[in-house]
From Swiss-Prot:
NCBIfam families given in the database record: bioB (TIGR00433)
Pathway annotation from the record: Cofactor biosynthesis; biotin biosynthesis; biotin from 7,8-diaminononanoate: step 2/2
UniProt source species: Shigella boydii serotype 18 (strain CDC 3083-94 / BS512)
Pfam family, any one: Radical_SAM
Cofactors demanded by this protein: [4Fe-4S] cluster; [2Fe-2S] cluster
Protein name from the UniProt record: Biotin synthase
PANTHER family attached to this UniProt entry: BIOTIN SYNTHASE, BIOTIN SYNTHASE, MITOCHONDRIAL
Bound cofactor: record note: Binds 1 [4Fe-4S] cluster. The cluster is coordinated with 3 cysteines and an exchangeable S-adenosyl-L-methionine.
Lineage, top ranks: Bacteria, Pseudomonadati, Pseudomonadota, Gammaproteobacteria, Enterobacterales
């Protein structure tokens, strides 16, 4: 592997200080060198075990420490999960992500998790999980089951992290990413904008991600979804341009990674989302629920794709199976579908 120079904090700070339009121009140039600028990878996320999490992440409604009105649910049955995966595939998703509100998986649950991964793979979808910290053996078992991606976010900079979470150390998160990588699973890791962090903290987060031995293949950038009952419910709103700037810097620093618009997208208007795509975002979560917070309605996403001339990406594992790609393309082009957008009619 060719030597990859490490980023410094001062270099990242310079990117954040660039005039926004110059930054967007640079990010779009980088993006076009490595990706088709009209393609967006589409994922669906399902909460397979909701609530009653023992951790104290101040942004999260799934923590048992906060009264958010969220009802705790046990681990879903394997067939329930696979039925959701079938629906996701029919709706056009190419990756199915399964999330559980745990500090770490219990050994007794591993056989069920392995069956979920195998079942999702059998459907021709990429499989992703986010289950908390993992042991080496758990990471290897998931890899053997066929897991493509494992999500484990760093959330924020090492310096600000202690203000948000105390029940899991930053090093534990880095250790889990290393175990996942060593097991041969691709890494999905990003963070949250709007926790009360400074621009320097945003730079610090991206610095950590970009300077990993191998940068994450997927980098979700979340906008804080403020949930009543959590300690961050009254945080200030994130300025749209600040969020777009973070997307652009992530694209420049990690040119071959997928940069995903994740939680908080329902708070963005179409113009903000369009600028995020211009800044280099090329992945979204598609569906009605993003774990326990709202996600834009599917049809609205397809309409936005149509307006911007974007296409849902077809994943390599689906060679010879074009069902969902054809469904999306047909919906975008057919006048009598809800997804159809006709600019001439406006």
């Amino acid at each position: 592997m060719a030597h990859r120079p490490r980023w410094t904090l001062s270099q990242v700070a310079e990117l954040f200080e660039k005039p926004l339009l110059d930054l967007l121009f640079e990010a779009q140039q980088v993006h076009r060198q490595h990706f088709d600028p009209r393609q967006v990878q589409v994922s669906t996320l399902l909460s397979i075990k909701t609530g009653a999490c023992p951790e104290d992440c101040k942004y999260c409604p799934q923590s048992s420490r906060y009264k958010t009105g969220l009802e705790a649910e046990r681990l879903m049955e394997v067939e329930q999960v696979l039925e959701s995966a079938r629906k996701a595939k029919a709706a056009g998703s190419t990756r199915f992500c399964m999330g559980a509100a745990w500090k770490n998986p219990n050994e007794r649950d591993m056989p069920y998790l392995e069956q979920m991964v195998q079942g999702v793979k059998d459907l021709g979808l990429e499989a992703c999980m986010t289950l908390g910290t993992l042991s080496e053996s758990q990471a290897q078992r998931l890899a053997n089951a066929g897991l493509d991606y494992y999500n484990h976010n760093l959330d924020t900079s090492p310096e600000f992290y202690g203000n948000i979470i105390t029940t899991r150390t930053y090093q534990e998160r880095l250790d889990t990413l290393e175990k996942v990588r060593d097991a041969g699973i691709k890494v999905c890791s990003g963070g949250i904008v709007g926790l009360g962090e400074t621009v320097k903290d945003r730079a610090g987060l991206l610095l950590q991600l970009a300077n990993l031995p191998t940068p994450p293949e997927s980098v979700p950038i979340n906008m804080l979804v403020k949930v009543k009952g959590t300690p961050l419910a009254d945080n200030d709103d994130v300025d749209a341009f600040d969020f777009i700037r973070t997307i652009a810097v992530a694209r420049i620093m990690m040119p071959t990674s997928y940069v995903r618009l994740s939680a908080g997208r329902e708070q963005m208007n179409e113009q903000t989302q369009a600028m995020c795509f211009m800044a280099g975002a090329n992945s979204i979560f598609y569906g009605c629920k993003l774990l326990t917070t709202p996600n834009p309605e599917e049809d609205k996403d397809l309409q936005l794709f149509r307006k911007l001339g974007l296409n849902p990406q077809q994943t390599a594992v689906l060679a010879g199976d074009n069902e969902q790609q054809q469904r999306l393309e047909q919906a975008l082009m057919t006048p009598d579908t809800d997804e159809y957008y006709n600019a001439a009619a406006l």
